Amino acid sequence: MGSFSIWHWLIVLLVVVMIFGTKKLRNMGSDLGGAVKGFKDGMKDGSTTDAPAASSAPAAQVTGQPANSDKSTIDVEARQKS
């Protein structure tokens, strides 16, 4: 009673194909595959380019003056818990 049989899954698959159509499902599958491939490439590129840059680049100095005097931004100062 707790699990679905093969007939339940076939009926669900048939309803999904009838609602979306095979062309739309194929497009969604290729879009999902492209997104996963792009994510993996980005993770691979990000890990190889960030490692040397982080070790050789000097740390930026934080000053009390805001770099941008835009009125729509909020200046927030971090404080330690006491």
UniProtKB/Swiss-Prot annotation:
InterPro entries per UniProt: TatA/B/E, TatA/E
Polar residues: compositionally biased ranges: 62-71
Source superkingdom: Bacteria
Keyword terms, alphabetized: Cell inner membrane, Cell membrane, Membrane, Protein transport, Translocation, Transmembrane, Transmembrane helix, Transport
Predominant location: membrane
Regions crossing the membrane: 1-21
Location(s) in or outside the cell: Cell inner membrane
Matching Pfam families: TatA_B_E
Membrane topology recorded in Swiss-Prot or TrEMBL: Single-pass membrane protein
Start-end of Low complexity biased regions: 51-60
Composition bias type Basic and acidic residues, residue spans: 72-82
Ranges where the record places region Disordered: 39-82
A GO BP entry: protein transport by the Tat complex
Gene Ontology CC: TAT protein transport complex
GO molecular function: protein transmembrane transporter activity
Keyword flag Transmembrane helix: yes
PANTHER family associated with the record: SEC-INDEPENDENT PROTEIN TRANSLOCASE PROTEIN TATA
Record NCBIfam families: PRK02958.1, tatAE
Assigned protein family: Belongs to the TatA/E family.
Record's function text: Part of the twin-arginine translocation (Tat) system that transports large folded proteins containing a characteristic twin-arginine motif in their signal peptide across membranes. TatA could form the protein-conducting channel of the Tat system.
Assembly notes: The Tat system comprises two distinct complexes: a TatABC complex, containing multiple copies of TatA, TatB and TatC subunits, and a separate TatA complex, containing only TatA subunits. Substrates initially bind to the TatABC complex, which probably triggers association of the separate TatA complex to form the active translocon.
Name of this protein: Sec-independent protein translocase protein TatA
